[in-house]
Structure formats: structure tokens, C-alpha cells
Amino acid sequence: MDEIVFFNPGDAIANSHDFGEALRSAQIYRTKDSLQSPLVIVKPTNDKDNGFSVYFADDADKNAAPDKTSYKVQKHI
């Protein structure tokens, strides 16, 4: 089952059209500050956006809000 979460798009740590690049960015960020909350790589649920974004997992919201976009979690880091 897909895990759907909501984030404010402006809070992204990194964005990329390539999953590998998003993963690399997340790993670099994690190495620099390993005490921060876990990270997630997500993909927007709407079909027109085909990129990946990296967010702090603790910032995820399970409820929709006008200023938030729905994402499907691709990987927890």
C-alpha cells in the first residue's frame, strides 16, 4: 500500500527529476547533519509532476491542507 503524506513544497531540502540524484542529495545532507530527523524521498501524486523531493520525515502531515501538496513516499532515509 502506498504511503501518502502532505508537505509544503517550499520546505523541500532538495528537488530533482532523477531519483538517484535526489537520493544522493539526501545522503549528502544526512552525512552533514546526522542528528536531524530522518529524511524521506517523495514523488507528487499528481501525474503532471514527475520529479522527486527530499523532506524531513517529521514535517510530514497525514491531513490535507490548502498550502500542502500530496506526495507518495518513495524511500525513508
Question: Where are the model-predicted features located?
Answer:
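A short, charged, amphipathic alpha-helix used as a generic interaction element across diverse proteins
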Residues: 15-37
